[in-house]
């Protein structure tokens, strides 16, 4: 089948066409290429893996060499560990056998090989080998006998497929050129300083013709007139000064570039996509990974066969042909797993494998089919030859970092990448941090008051929650905390010594500097100021103690119809105190506070049985201290021992309903004055 070669020398890209389809691509990367010979220095030795890193002049990546690839170094000495064969800063002659991929440097070998048109010279090799593609036994015998006669002593030879039916003089001339090239490399290795590049096939046209030209080629197109002359000269050198018959050599002169005119760029774009459509309507998916390449075959919209068996077999046949082409076009190497459509017939499976094997015969990378697994997967391996298409023309996505997808996490707006090397251009709005122009101003209320908040103010009977805000316990808790914070605020300012004139001080408890978290807004106060009606209630000391223990409001002794404690300001006085006044001579009545403690909001020093506590907080008088002495031992308070001045009837009347209101599960609480 005729072939044609299109060479774009300006872009260092060449394509091989067969049946109007691109079968192979040749790309010159300009960096370390397969076949380059370097004089390197041993940089690091790793005895644990029997390998070493060789400095070949690349500032970013060193070359990797295994102990099995040392070649002449291993042959000269007794076999041992790599630390016995190599030493740091030792000069070694190495050749690139695998180009760098990703974060890995080039794979090196000490077994140097010099490829020619018909022969491959192996200076450190042994014996004579022939290409497997030479099928005729007579030709194999002729070439083997010739190679044995002309082989240099101490070296090895490999006869290439192109040497078939070639005269002996051309083969001998090719071998002489290889020997001269090797002698030049040895001279440079003795005189040059390491690390240094000693030999590279810089002539791109010569390299393409050497690897791709065969007797099946009938046309060669190049983009420059100078390139056309060099092609003719090279072909004449290989054919004893004559141009091969039936080969047309052209120079591209169209307005479009040679890559666009022959649809080379379009083919590269399609080859970089994972999906490949088949002529019958099916398609295949090619997914390269770090460990291997996975290929999946799907029938798609193909429904033209009479039964499902023919549909599956026909789709698998088309997929096998296209997969063999894609392996060469994309230069996929390593382990390859193919998931063909399941076939129940064992005969169909064998036919598919035979057809697939015939399609792979034209591949120079020598793919080998390993087996057909029980799950219907075809395993094969293909020799790596340089970089694949993804490494040559692709790079990791800056958005996803090469993962192939972005993620949107719960509670976040926008998609982000999971790769730390990705540069996210669309960062979620909530993650964008605004610059802070000035440090946050600390408020006095933000000062630490963990310890000071435990200090309670003196009890005041007039503002006791049980009297003033009975039934509104939620707001009562907030109000008590607010009063406690105001009290602790003064204590903090005195103890810490913070002055407002010295500038703001950040608070570690209230405000936190985060990305774009809005400042916390204070909840507006819902307190409504009410005008309280002053009420004077005459009570003895014992009555005050009993009312406080039972949680009874002194308003019961008044004649007001509305006895809501939140509407009155109660003043409790002892018998005759209204006439005499208090002991400090101010003329004001004795103030008292009744504190109600809820079971769910206990302090550190307050019992948890929900009793009411009475305490007086004005200037110390005999009237105020009397209940404190009696409450120390509450068991001594007995109703029959009341004084004559205390009316017994009201106490009995008040105590009777109190006993009826007691519940079985209620416990009595000691006074806070104790």
Swiss-Prot record:
Start and end residues of each S1 motif domain: 35-117
Region of interest (Disordered), residue spans: 458-529, 626-674
GO cellular component: cytoplasm; plasma membrane
Cofactor(s) recorded in Swiss-Prot or TrEMBL: Mg(2+)
Matching Gene3D superfamilies: Nucleic acid-binding proteins
Subunit structure: Fractionates in a 250-300 kDa region, which is too small to be the equivalent of an RNA degradosome, as occurs with E.coli RNase E. Interacts with polynucleotide phosphorylase (PNPase, pnp), probably via the C4 Arg-rich motif (residues 665-673).
Function: Endoribonuclease that plays a central role in rRNA processing and mRNA decay, and probably tRNA processing. Acts on 9S rRNA (the precursor of 5S rRNA) and RNAI, a molecule that controls the replication of ColE1 plasmid. Upon expression in E.coli does not purify with endogenous degradosome proteins. Prefers 5'-monophosphorylated substrates over 5'-triphosphorylated substrates. Complements an rne temperature-sensitive mutation in E.coli, despite being considerably shorter and not able to interact with the E.coli degradosome. Cleaves AU-rich sequences in vitro, tested with psbA2 mRNA. mRNA for psbA2, one of the core proteins in photosystem II, is degraded in the dark under control of a cis-acting AU-rich box in its 5'-UTR. RNase E cuts in this box, suggesting it is involved in this dark-induced mRNA instability.
Protein name: Ribonuclease E
Species whose genome carries this gene: Synechocystis sp. (strain ATCC 27184 / PCC 6803 / Kazusa)
Encoding gene, per UniProt annotation: rne
């Amino acid at each position: 089948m005729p072939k044609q070669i299109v060479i774009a020398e300006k872009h260092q890209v060449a394509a091989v066409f067969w049946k109007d389809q691109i079968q192979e691509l040749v790309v010159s990367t300009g960096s370390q290429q397969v076949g380059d010979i370097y004089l390197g220095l041993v940089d690091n030795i790793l005895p644990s893996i029997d390998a070493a890193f060789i400095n070949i002049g690349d500032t970013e990546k060193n070359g990797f060499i295994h102990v099995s690839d040392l070649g002449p170094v291993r042959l000269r000495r007794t076999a041992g560990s790599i630390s016995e064969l190599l030493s740091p800063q030792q000069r070694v002659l190495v050749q690139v056998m695998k180009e760098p991929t990703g974060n890995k440097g080039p794979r090196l070998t000490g077994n140097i090989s010099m490829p020619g048109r018909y022969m491959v010279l192996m200076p450190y090799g042994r014996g004579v080998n022939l290409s497997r593609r030479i099928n005729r036994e007579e030709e194999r015998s002729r070439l083997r006998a010739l190679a044995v006669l002309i082989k240099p002593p101490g070296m090895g030879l490999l006869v290439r497929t192109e040497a078939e039916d070639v005269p002996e003089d051309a083969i001998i001339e090719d071998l002489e050129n290889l020997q001269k090239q090797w002698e030049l490399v040895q001279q440079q290795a003795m005189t040059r300083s390491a690390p240094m590049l000693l030999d590279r096939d810089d002539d791109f046209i010569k390299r393409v013709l050497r690897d791709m030209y065969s007797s099946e080629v009938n046309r060669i197109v190049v983009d420059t007139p100078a390139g056309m002359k060099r092609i003719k000269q090279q072909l004449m050198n290989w054919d004893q000064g004559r141009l091969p018959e039936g080969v047309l050599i052209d120079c591209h002169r169209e307005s479009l570039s040679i890559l666009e005119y022959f649809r080379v760029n379009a083919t590269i774009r399609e080859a970089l996509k994972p999906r490949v459509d088949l002529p019958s309507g099916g398609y295949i998916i090619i997914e390269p990974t770090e460990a291997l390449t996975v290929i999946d075959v799907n029938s798609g919209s193909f429904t033209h066969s009479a039964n499902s068996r023919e549909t599956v077999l026909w789709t698998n046949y088309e997929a096998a042909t296209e997969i063999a082409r894609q392996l060469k076009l994309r230069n996929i190497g390593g382990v390859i797993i193919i998931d063909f459509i399941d076939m129940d017939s064992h005969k169909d499976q064998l036919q598919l494998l035979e057809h697939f094997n015939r399609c792979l015969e034209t591949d120079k990378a020598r793919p080998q089919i390993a087996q057909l697994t029980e799950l219907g997967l075809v395993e094969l391996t293909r020799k790596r030859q340089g970089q694949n298409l993804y490494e040559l023309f692709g790079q990791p996505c800056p958005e996803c970092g090469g993962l192939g997808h972005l993620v949107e996490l719960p509670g976040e707006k926008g998609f982000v990448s999971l790769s730390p090397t990705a540069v996210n251009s669309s960062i979620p709005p909530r993650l964008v941090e605004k610059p802070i122009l000035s440090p946050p101003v600390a408020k006095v209320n933000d000062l630490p008051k963990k310890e000071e908040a435990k200090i309670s103010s003196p009890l005041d009977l007039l503002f006791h929650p049980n009297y003033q805000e009975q039934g509104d316990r939620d707001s009562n808790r907030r109000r008590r905390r607010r009063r406690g914070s105001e009290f602790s605020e003064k204590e903090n300012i005195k103890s810490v010594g913070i002055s407002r004139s010295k500038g703001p001080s950040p608070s570690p408890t209230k405000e936190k500097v985060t990305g774009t978290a809005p400042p916390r807004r204070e909840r507006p106060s819902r307190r409504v100021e009410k005008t309280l009606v002053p009420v004077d209630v005459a009570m003895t000391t014992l009555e005050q103690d009993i009312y406080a223990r039972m949680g009874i409001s002194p308003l019961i002794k008044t004649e007001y119809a509305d006895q809501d404690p939140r509407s009155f300001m109660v003043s409790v006085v002892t018998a005759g105190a209204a006439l005499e006044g208090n002991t400090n001579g101010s003329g004001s009545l004795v103030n008292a506070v009744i504190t109600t403690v809820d079971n769910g909001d206990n302090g550190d020093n307050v019992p948890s049985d929900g009793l009411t506590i009475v305490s007086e907080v004005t200037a110390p008088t005999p009237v105020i201290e009397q209940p404190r002495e009696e409450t120390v031992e509450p068991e001594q308070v007995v109703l029959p021992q009341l004084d004559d001045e205390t009316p017994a009837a009201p106490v009995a009347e008040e105590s009777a309903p109190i006993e009826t209101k007691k519940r079985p599960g209620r416990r009595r609480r000691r006074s806070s004055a104790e």
